[in-house]
Structures are given as structure tokens and as C-alpha cells.
Amino acid sequence: MALARFFIPHLLISLCAICLHNGGWWPWTFFLGLSVLVTIGDRLCPRDHADLQGVNPRTANALLFAIWPLLIALVALVIVSVAVGIQQVTLPLLGAGYAERWDYTPLQVLGVVLSVGLLIGGVGTSAAHECMHRPRGHRLRTVGDWLMALSMDGVFPIEHNHGHHKNVGTVHDAATARYGESVYRFIGRSTWGEYANAWRVERERLERQSRGLWSLHNRYLRALARSAAFPILAALVGGGFCALVVLLSMLWAKVLLETVNYIEHYGLVRVPNAPIEPRHSWNSTAWMSGTITFLLTRHSHHHQHGALPFWRLNDMPDAPMLPWGYLSAIYIALLRHAHYRAVMQPHLDHWFDHYASREECQLAARS
């Protein structure tokens, strides 16, 4: 069954829930174990050239839909465990032993944040990205909105569909990392640009429809409310510290999302209004990364045909390729940025020599 591998994200969320249930150092074990599994798996597994054209779309969509309740349940477990174990909140149906099991130290809480944020940012936002490219009115669009809210980025679908896919590779795209730009500078610039552009897009949409800006018709305001709902719920159940843990998990997921943006287009350029081609994205055939991200790794084909569902994306082996899998690239960009730039330099040189148009080379030389 071609889709069998895409049950792995669901198993990972379930495994993380078991680790949270066990408490103690188990969340750290999950985070480190998953990081090693994906980074080494990307190196050892065969390149991902699988053709999924014949899969059942209803099954594939069901896999995406299922990520939503699983991650909501995982966040709920975080709220309950911190509320009971640290805030000493008494909840019905839970025995006294849970308070001791979930009495996390600050370092153990960090393990919870890293584990849950990794799944939200790696699995959740990837499923959300797939959902928000569905036709308007499709039920998965709502799933995508709520999944993006978990990464403190509910406005992402507005800007991504109307901005990034139109402006990728140009100076008008906040989500394209510039040559030599550090990932931390990029995260700030991209986030600010995304929120500002999403507000502009939504304001113009409401003006065209003669609807009020400060109303329930405003998708931007609804997106902010969805993101705020999770830490507010955590505060109501378990107090301020519980809300902080949930908020930090969501912010870590946001960092991961922006770092994915960073690695997908780092240093690439495109002349404004020129056709978007496979060369304008860094592609990857890493099997583990592709499995966990629902083939977000086939980014070159995605940007050429944004409406295609993940099972119809081709691997495009002739597109520019990342030298690592996604998670390896993320960790290197975050922890060893100078090394990231050094390794990417020959790949960028090759891109300008073999992929870039004359106009793109001239554009890069002037920037």
C-alpha cells in the first residue's frame, strides 16, 4: 500500500503521548530519539522516488484529517499533565499517582516543549500546508486553519496562498531567505512580513466585498483568536505556568516552520513576474523527511503546481537539491549557521552556473 508510510506521523504523535503519560525524562527520550531517527534515517534510507499517482484520494485526505484530533489531544495532555503535576490541580478521574508522575523539573518541562513543538512544527504544519491548498470550501481548509493556529501562525494560509506562491524568489517575498542571511534574522523578517502582508490581503478582500474590517468576516482576526485559544484554555485549566508551557511549544513550532521556509528557498532568486519553475526551490528526496512532512520535500513541483495534492507531486530529480534531509538542515541552520552557509555555497554556485537565467544572475549581482 503506497500510503502505508504516511501512517508514521500518526504513530509518532501517539508515541509522544505515551511518553508524556509516563512523565519524567520520557519526553526528552522521545525528542532525542525522533531527531536521531529522522536525521540518520534520511541518510540511510533509499532516495524517495516513489510514484503515488494511483492512491485513493479519500484515504489520503483521511490521513491528513486525522492529524488534527491527534495533535489537539496531545496538547490537551500537555495541559492536563502540567496542571496536575506542577500546578497541583485536582482533576476528576485521575488518581493521586499522576501528580507525582508529572511533577516535572524545569529541564523535564523543556523536554515536553521540544517534543510537542517538534510534532506541531514538523507534522502539524506540514499537514496544514497540504490542507490549506485545497479548493475553497473543502473541509480540510478548516483543518488547516486550526493546525496552523497551533504554531502561533494562523494568518499563514492568507499570506502563503496569496503572497508567497506569487512572489517566491523575489524581493517582494518575505518567506524567501536571502543569500548570507542568518536564520534568526530571517525568522524575524519573515514573520513581520507575513503578518503585514496577510493584513493587507485581508483588508483588500473585505473592501472588495464591501464588508467591515473589524467584523467576524475578517479571517485575520479569526486566525489570531484561534491561536490565542490554546494558551487561554491552558491558563483556565492549569494557571499561568501551564499557559507558558503551551505557548512555548507553539512558538518552538513557529521557529521550525520559519526554518523550513528558510531552507526551501535560501539564496535563490527570480525576476518578478517571471514564470515560477522547479529551479526556484530547493528540493529533497530524503525518505524520512518526505514521510513526516507529507512530501513537502517535493517543493519544486509544489511551487510549479501549488494546487496538486501531495500524492500527485513528482520527485523532480533534476531540480536543485538540498544536501541534507529537512530535519538535519533545520538543526544545522539553527545551531551552526556558518557551517550551513559554507555547505550551501557550492550548491548555490552550481545553481547560478546551471539553473539561473541571465537575468537572475544579473539580479543577484546587483543585490
Which positions does each model-derived feature cover?
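Cytosolic/stromal cytosol-facing helical appendages immediately following the last transmembrane segment
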Residues: M1-A17, R136-Y220, F241, V246, ...
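Structural hydrophobic-scaffold residues in regular secondary structure
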Residues: H129, H164, L233-A234, H299
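Short membrane-interface loop/juxtamembrane segments of multi-pass integral membrane proteins
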Residues: L52-Q53, A96-E100, R200-E207
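Alpha-helical bilayer-embedded segments of polytopic membrane proteins, i.e.
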Residues: M1-C45, R58-Q87, L93-G121, L216-N261
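Alpha-helical transmembrane segments with an aromatic anchor "belt"
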Residues: L52-A62, R270-P278
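Juxtamembrane transmembrane-helix termini
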Residues: D48-D51, S81-L91, M132, G267, ...
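C-terminal ends of transmembrane helices
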Residues: D42-L52, T125-E130
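Intramembrane catalytic core of multi-pass membrane enzymes that act on lipidic substrates
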Residues: T59-G188
